[in-house]
Amino acid sequence: MLSKFSAATLLSTGLSIPASCRLIILLAALSVVGFHAGHAAPPPAAQPLALTPPMGWNDWAHYQCGINEQIILDNASALVKTGLAARGYSTVTIDDCWMLKDRDAAGNLQADPVRFPHGMKYVADAVHHLGLKFGIYEDSGSTTCAEFAGSGWPKGGGSDHFIQDASLFASWGVDYLKLDGCNVYVYFASEGPAAYRKAYDEEHVALKNTGRPIVFSESAPAYFEFSPEWYDVLTWVRNFGQLWREGDDIATYSAKTPDQPRFASVLWNYAYNLPLGRFQKPGNWNDPDFIIAGDPGMSLAESRSQLALWSMMSAPLILSSDVGKLNPDALAILGNRRVIAIDQDPLGQMATLVERKPGMDLLLKPLKDGDYAVAVLNRSEAPLEVIIDPVALGFASASGCTFDAENLWSGERTFTLTTLNADIAPHDTAIWSIHTHTACGEPTRTGAIVMTTDKPHGSIDGYAHCLAATGAVEECAGTPEQTWTFTEEGALDSAQGCLSAVDGKPALKPCSGADAQQHWNYTLSGNLVNASNNLCLTNASPSATGQPLTVQACGHNQLNQIWSLPN
């Protein structure tokens, strides 16, 4: 859960201190009142955590601060009774507002005695008794987003509580920690990333030293969303936790406006998450926020779309709804074993955006067993008829490529197909698993190459533009000129030739594996660096369309040099 203040506001918290203090970043004291120094050493060969995307339930998107002990335990019981726990939704996490604003005399967090009269150890034990895991929320700042006691150092500096709180959580039996990023004290705004890194590193070490395996969900990237620092933070969070929120919250439910549509929020979170596949691998997951499928404000078609899209992105599947009130159709969607298996596939690779045109996205995801998942999202308000040729997915263009397909919603299987055909309702998503035959070969890394704009918080079409063989970035239209193959040699191959760096300008030339001008190195930061001159493929600005591209000296997180390629 994110504060609704901007990152700049969050990072200016300490500016009331005179500039003459010249504090860089306050170091938290190691001593903590009332805490003893003995810690169990972590197991010498601890097993990696969250090798598949975490699944479970969290209260926030449905209840916000309106939680109590009974609500948490009722939802935990409902996960078991509905069969969702058996499908993998097995971690129950309490979000913000569970604690008091003040700590006790020993400096420990205190559960709100009105909301949780039996305390957190009781709730954790009850959840464990159901065969589930227990998660809890805290904040890396001085207070949580809802202004309750946080784990971080106070405004103006002082001791933090990361070690003390981690020890307390372990004593309660916590299996999962969500650490938010509101109210982190930073003296100079430019030092924000370093302050966040310090906080999350300290929490990582504190959790490790408890000796208890606790999955660590970080929120730091979300507080730098769309800024140049975003990519730095996305790079280092992988060293500390297993998953991270990297952008806007999903729309929450309100009893005052229960039928308020929420699908636009789902599409937006999908939009900002999809281009970040390069940061993800087993044990490290981008988290576009909660699954609200089946909750008020989501139709059945929209619910299918969210589960399908999150599964194609290998995203965490963390429900946030009143589980006991989910109707049978919603339960059937959320409990669909075939779609969940796509999400939980051990390869853990995010889908490639094969094609984007107004109202439609086509996605391809490789699976560990050699099969593939294919999904088509209908973003429009009209029915959509699709016919997908395997060549469009990167398979061999020679005749004879056939495949078997399973419709993952219906379970229907068809054999020896030459195309995938579907009629897709508005806001719905068709999803299949396909098994190709020998003539298809291995698919190439084929799809759209996109640049995200500097005008976020809008539509999918406005957020990302597509590289075209014209030598410019254009609005995505799904044309052959916007389809690229990133070859094993590092060439960017279009139907009209390979992108080359010639005299400081990109140009299409006949493909030649020996031509260094056609070799591009793709970095984790998103740069396309030409092997002949070590210069970066550059747009006039992140939002520019129709303007000639150039190759220029690579800047640090320069937004008009950051690209998302087929995975």
Task: Locate each region found by the language model.
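Bacterial N-terminal signal peptides
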Residues: S12-G14, C21-G34
